[in-house]
Structure formats: structure tokens, C-alpha cells
């Protein structure tokens, strides 16, 4: 069996990792052993934060909806309860968009929720 020299593949693998580590600070962008660890950790952070991003945006939407709802003398939880009772199927992203960019439409949605709450009581 003939001898296999691994220099080409090793260099390619190292180059790939060092390219992924471009822009990192100090040895993390220059030394293969450290860069490899940094790239792996960056991948773990990226994976985790793709999940966290969804939670963060949902909480941002809730904060925006709550702020806009309180301007109409109703709390966030009462608004959501009223919308559920009224059968309005707007998600929090859509409600937040209305609250920020279309205040008249949001006011109409709030009135619908208030009417549903008043009807039940």
C-alpha cells in the first residue's frame, strides 16, 4: 500500500477554520488550536440565540402592546382576554405592528376587546 501524505487536507481544514474565525480578537483569529475552539463556541452561541431571538421578540411585542393598550385604559392581559372572547385572531406581532404604525386600527381593536369584556360582565 502506498503512503498517504496528509499535508494538503490538513492545510485545507486549518484554512477553513481560520477563515471562519476571521475578525476574532488576538490568537482566536490566528492560531488554529484556539480558533477551532472559538468557532465551535460561536456555533453554540448562534444555535442557542436563534431560539432566544424568538422569545426576545415576543416579549418586545408584549411590551409594545401593553404600552399602547394602557393609553386606552386597558391592561395587556385584559386586552388579550377581551380579544379571545371577541374571537379576534390577531397574533402579538400583528397587534404590535398596529400599535406602533396604525394607531387608529389598534384603537378599533381595543374597542372590540372592551365590548367583548363588557358583554360578558
From Swiss-Prot:
GO molecular function: rRNA binding; structural constituent of ribosome
Presence of keyword Lyase: no
GO cellular-component term (any): ribonucleoprotein complex
Gene Ontology BP, a term: translation
Key words of the record: Ribonucleoprotein, Ribosomal protein, RNA-binding, rRNA-binding
Gene3D superfamilies in alphabetical order: 6.10.160.10, Ribosomal protein L20 (1.10.1900.20)
Keyword rRNA-binding: yes
Classification via PROSITE patterns: RIBOSOMAL_L20 (PS00937)
Protein origin, superkingdom: Bacteria
Function: Binds directly to 23S ribosomal RNA and is necessary for the in vitro assembly process of the 50S ribosomal subunit. It is not involved in the protein synthesizing functions of that subunit.
Family: Belongs to the bacterial ribosomal protein bL20 family.
UniProt protein name: Large ribosomal subunit protein bL20
Organism: Francisella tularensis subsp. mediasiatica (strain FSC147)
Amino acid at each position: 500500500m502506498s503512503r498517504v501524505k496528509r499535508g494538503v487536507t490538513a492545510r485545507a481544514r486549518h484554512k477553513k477554520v481560520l477563515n471562519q474565525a476571521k475578525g476574532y480578537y488576538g490568537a482566536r483569529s490566528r492560531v488554529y488550536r484556539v480558533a477551532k475552539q472559538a468557532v465551535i463556541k460561536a456555533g453554540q452561541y448562534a444555535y442557542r440565540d436563534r431560539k432566544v431571538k424568538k422569545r426576545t421578540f415576543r416579549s418586545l411585542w408584549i411590551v409594545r402592546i401593553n404600552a399602547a393598550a394602557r393609553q386606552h385604559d386597558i391592561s395587556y392581559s385584559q386586552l388579550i382576554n377581551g380579544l379571545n372572547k371577541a374571537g379576534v385572531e390577531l397574533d402579538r406581532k400583528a397587534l404590535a405592528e398596529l400599535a406602533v404604525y396604525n394607531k387608529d386600527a389598534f384603537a378599533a381593536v381595543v374597542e372590540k376587546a372592551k365590548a367583548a369584556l363588557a358583554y360578558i360582565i
